[in-house]
Swiss-Prot record:
Subcellular location, record wording: Cytoplasm
GO molecular function annotations of the record: ribosome binding; translation initiation factor activity
Keyword terms, alphabetized: Cytoplasm, Initiation factor, Protein biosynthesis
PANTHER family associated with the record: TRANSLATION INITIATION FACTOR IF-3 (PTHR10938), TRANSLATION INITIATION FACTOR IF-3, MITOCHONDRIAL (PTHR10938:SF0)
Similarity remark: Belongs to the IF-3 family.
Gene name as annotated: infC
Protein name per Swiss-Prot or TrEMBL: Translation initiation factor IF-3
PROSITE patterns: IF3
Entries under Gene3D superfamilies matching the protein: Translation initiation factor 3 (IF-3), C-terminal domain, Translation initiation factor 3 (IF-3), N-terminal domain
Keyword Cytoplasm assigned: yes
HAMAP family per the UniProt record, alphabetical: IF_3
Amino acid sequence: MKGGKRVQPARPNRINREIRAQEVRLTGVDGEQIGIVSLNEALEKAEEAGVDLVEISPNAEPPVCRIMDYGKFLYEKSKSTKEQKEEQKVIQVKEIKFRPGTDDGDYQVKLRNLIRFLEDGDKAKITLRFRGPEMAHQQIGMEVLNPLRKDLCEDMDLAVVESFPTKIEGRQMIMVLAPKKKQ
């Protein structure tokens, strides 16, 4: 194994003695404005409070610094970004395949799955696959897709049609449904 120094990740904010400015605009622990003070005076106030002096806005003139517990600040920041990530939902496209001769029982099962996908907030891609002599009968494909569109978009008001096929593309017809936005 190779030995070496472990590189510390760069901190986004300078703290305490890392601050280079001679004068800083200081904000207290509770967010109150203290005013423009020398760096040494700001460091003394932070030390008295038992916390860190953190450079919040280094590009301001003079730089803005706040007296705060830096460890707690980083923890709160990482916690809030983690919560934001959890709240975001990645929309997936779920696919259900039909055939022109899909029977009513299979249709109902696939319809239930489509309803579940749309209620979960995912898009649904309905692929109607043709084989052999079925290619000549596009209207049979429409007889499968139109009831689906009617059931999901008009009767249940669950989805909006993003794309609806007008003709066979290759050996299949594809309809894409997106969930309706919840108020």
